[in-house]
Amino acid sequence: MSLVHMNIGLAFTVAFLGLLMYRSHLMSSLLCLEGMMLTLFIMSSIMVLNMHFTLASMLPIILLVFAACEAAVGLSLLVMVSNTYGVDYVQNLNLLQC
């Protein structure tokens, strides 16, 4: 395993641990999720380039599309919660149910 793979794995682990530790605020959770998606994108791009697997060359693009959708939904939830309650706590998401 090369040093690049270990650094990317470590970055994913740090982002995941950040998601577990700072899960009370929605903004912190969204930043950790974006870090995880960025490391997954880099890892999939490196894997496609190293294996010369042309059929899977769309995988990083599809991953970026899902990351953009996740960011848009997360930011809209953040705006809705902060406008409604004035804070960005994740526990306020349970109060948004009809």
Curated annotation (Swiss-Prot):
Instruction: List locations, semicolon-separated.
Output: Mitochondrion inner membrane
**Electron transport among keywords:** yes
Q: What class of enzyme is it?
A: translocase
Q: State one molecular function term (GO).
A: NADH dehydrogenase (ubiquinone) activity
Gene Ontology terms: biological process: ATP synthesis coupled electron transport
Q: Which residues cross the membrane?
A: 1-21, 29-49, 61-81
The record's family statement is: Belongs to the complex I subunit 4L family.
Function description: Core subunit of the mitochondrial membrane respiratory chain NADH dehydrogenase (Complex I) which catalyzes electron transfer from NADH through the respiratory chain, using ubiquinone as an electron acceptor. Part of the enzyme membrane arm which is embedded in the lipid bilayer and involved in proton translocation.
Q: How does it assemble?
A: Core subunit of respiratory chain NADH dehydrogenase (Complex I) which is composed of 45 different subunits.
What is the protein's name according to its record?
A: NADH-ubiquinone oxidoreductase chain 4L
Q: Which gene encodes it?
A: MT-ND4L
